[in-house]
Amino acid sequence: MGLREFAGLKRDDQRLDPFALARFAKLLVATFAEIEPYLTPETRAHLIGDGKDKWSGGAASQTLPDGRKLIILNPTHGKNRQNATLMEEICHVFLGHKPSRLAIKKRGKNGETIARDYNEAIEEEAYSTGAAALAPYTALLRMVNDGKTSQEIARHFDVSRALVEYRIKVSRLWDAYKEKVFQGD
C-alpha cells in the first residue's frame, strides 16, 4: 500500500497532509515554541538566527515513553517547505531507515562543526519518496500536459516550486513541461 492510499486519499490530485499522516508513523511533531523553554538562549539564537539555513527539521534519536519519535521543524521555513521536511521524516520511518546520529564528528578547516552522521543514499530515498507522495506522477503528468506552471502545481499540492520542479525532472517530464509552459515565449 502506498503512502497516499495509507493516508486515505482517493484521487491522485488530492493534497496530502503530512501533519495528519505523522501520527500513523508514530511521530510527535512539536512546535518550536514548545521546545523553546528547554533551549539555552545561545542555542535558540543559533537555530533561528545564523544557523536557520543549516537545518530543516530533525527527529530525536530516542523514542518517547509512548513509542513515538519527537520531530522538530525549522520555524523560519514556510508551510510548503515544512510539508516536504515532515514527509521526508515520515518516509524514513515507513522505509525502515536507521536514524542518523547527531554528534560532533570533527571540526572543519575553518573551525566549523561537522555534526551529522549523514547517509546521502537514505536521505535521497526518503526525500524522493516523500516528494512522490506529495506530488504524484499521474497528477503531475496531467497538470504538465494542461500547461500548469510549477508555481501553480506547487500551490495546488502546498509544496515548494523547487519540489515540483524536482519531481518534473526526475519523472522525465521536464521537456514536455518546458514545451507547454514556454511555448508562448
Report the location of each language-model feature.
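Active-site hotspot residues in diverse enzymes, especially metal/ion-binding acidic/histidine motifs
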Residues: 1-185
